[in-house]
Design a protein with these regions (language model features):
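Divalent metal-coordination and catalytic microenvironments
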Residues: 4, 41, 48, 99, ...
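Short hydrophobic/aromatic-enriched beta-strand-loop microsegments
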Residues: 3, 61-63, 79-87, 158-163
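Pre-active-site segment of Zn-dependent metallo-hydrolases
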Residues: 2-42, 49-54, 108-118, 144-155
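Cap/insert and terminal regions of metallo-dependent hydrolase folds
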Residues: 61, 67-70, 134, 142-220
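Active-site metal-binding loops of divalent metal-dependent hydrolases
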Residues: 5-7, 42, 68, 104-106, ...
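Metallo-beta-lactamase
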Residues: 64-133, 220
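Glycine/Thr-rich phosphate-binding loops of Rossmann-like dinucleotide-binding domains
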Residues: 11, 47, 72, 109, ...
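Residue-level marker for buried hydrophobic side chains located in beta-strands
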Residues: 1-3, 135-137
């Protein structure tokens, strides 16, 4: 399973954009066989057209939010393997694995200039169920009251991955270390408690400068 892969050295439409401080540990050619490709949303630090084009396992099952399937089918992926999902849709991959897309407090936009493409495609987190175990892979998300309802519906969850970086946009956002669309470490733990997640791994930090907090601050 691979999630939101970006194998380029920077996030952006061309050669420019935030540069990675930490490069990918593998190249595309070094990837082991991938059977399931999950994409949470279309922001440049999560969806790379170059990675999609050059991905070596185009027979993999691909699960994406609504309106993002075209980026795969036009780049050589089989149409019957690319499935767009709405919130609360569940897809059975095989007898052992099923995947549900669940809501996130986020947004979508592909082009930098103008607002014409804002929220034209969906975004969402993934709940992966495998032989009685549940793994939550979060889309970028801010805190939201609906996570308590999701915890009642889907919990308990064995393992959760969630963002702990890109939370300081002060003074663009009035309150320092608070973001509507991302969580700081303390907010992530609260969110995961609402979801009834047993163990949590913080991600989405230390790779590139996407906001105003020091890049290595989140785990501190």
């Amino acid at each position: 399973i691979i999630t939101d892969p970006v194998f380029e050295k920077n996030y952006g439409p061309l050669w420019f954009g935030p540069k990675k401080y930490v490069e990918s540990p593998l190249t595309l050619k070094e990837l082991p066989e991938i059977n399931l490709f999950l994409l949470t949303h279309n922001h440049y630090d999560h969806m790379s057209i170059r990675t999609i084009k050059n991905f070596p396992y185009k027979n993999a099952e691909v699960l994406v939010p609504l309106k993002l399937g075209k980026y795969f089918t036009r780049n050589g992926y089989k149409k019957d393997k690319v499935k767009e999902m709405d919130w609360f849709d569940t897809i059975k991959i095989n007898d052992d694995i099923k995947v549900t897309m669940i809501p996130a407090q986020h947004w979508s936009k592909r082009w930098i200039w103008g607002d014409g493409n804002t929220d034209r495609s969906l975004w969402g987190s993934f709940l992966i169920e495998y032989k009685g175990k549940k793994i939550f892979f979060a889309c970028d998300t801010g805190p939201a009251p609906f996570y308590k309802d999701l915890g009642e519906k889907f919990g308990p969850i064995d393992l959760g991955f969630g963002n702990i970086g890109a939370y300081n946009f002060f003074p663009i956002i009035n309150e320092k270390d608070k973001s509507v669309f991302h969580t700081n470490p303390e907010e992530l733990l609260s969110l995961m408690q609402d979801l009834k997640v047993k163990k949590v791994i913080g991600m989405h930090w230390g790779t590139a400068i996407l906001s105003l907090e020091p890049i290595w601050e989140p785990p501190v």
